[in-house]
Amino acid sequence: MSKYSDAKELAGLTLGKKTEYANQYDASLLQPVPRSLNRDDLELGDTLPFLGHDIWTLYELSWLNSKGLPQVAVGEVYIPATSANLIESKSFKLYLNSYNQTRFASWEEVAERLTQDLSACAGEKVLVEVNPVGHYTNQPIVTMEGECIDDQDIEINSYDFDADLLAGAAGEDQVEEVLHSHLLKSNCLITNQPDWGSVEIRYQGAKIDREKLLRYLVSFREHNEFHEQCVERIFTDLMKYCQPNKLTVFARYTRRGGLDINPYRSTEQDKPAHNHRMARQ
């Protein structure tokens, strides 16, 4: 359990509570969660050690046009890691549902409304794309880059989060490589529901021991924290224990409630080259 799981900022969230589903547009449904909650726990100061975005894919986005004909789209939302707040996912889902029976004059109006409301909730300008379903016709399903570290013949008996599993993980050889794992699993901070993901780690520096890295990632299995917070924890732990010269951590989580969340944190750039979904998404 995270140190801030009982924070007063979390007490008013709709997450984990019986909820009425509105079908008329209502921006007040969005609920922010201060990023400072876990960043204080990670001892991050005002100057963040990373760039990044939280990339959301909206698979259940629908509204009515001016004549009442339903429209459907896929949305992509880029929330800067520098924003004061992350957006709580159930409130995001409820907010999107409120578009379902609301008339909008154009697709552009929908995109503008989403941008305005999500930016207000996050506390910083958010980038929004509203794309027709056909936009994705030729987009491939991808896998993560680099070498998968999952097929190791090791025994694991503990699933409690332990950052110290990375102690001594930095070797003597200097490398530049990309590793990934599909075994990332944590639990929702509020509901304890499982969150399933894959994580890609791109770095330059002392070679990281793959067994220690895999044991560390598996230790998230019973850990309660939001997606974005887990990725920032992975980033800061790798910087602390392995001290790479360059580091990028990119996780892609399976969707829930028509949304997937893909946090990206890097010393090098603020977003990935593309936002292509994986087989489990």
Curated annotation (Swiss-Prot):
Reaction(s) catalysed (UniProt annotation): 7-aminomethyl-7-carbaguanine + 2 NADP(+) = 7-cyano-7-deazaguanine + 2 NADPH + 3 H(+)
Residues bound to substrate: I87, E88, S89, H227, E228
UniProt binding sites for NADPH: S89, K90, R256, G257
GO aspect biological process, one term: queuosine biosynthetic process
Any one GO CC term of the record: cytoplasm
Pathway noted in the entry: tRNA modification; tRNA-queuosine biosynthesis
Protein family (similarity comment): Belongs to the GTP cyclohydrolase I family. QueF type 2 subfamily.
NCBIfam families: QueF
Protein name: NADPH-dependent 7-cyano-7-deazaguanine reductase
Species name: Vibrio parahaemolyticus serotype O3:K6 (strain RIMD 2210633)
Gene that encodes it: queF
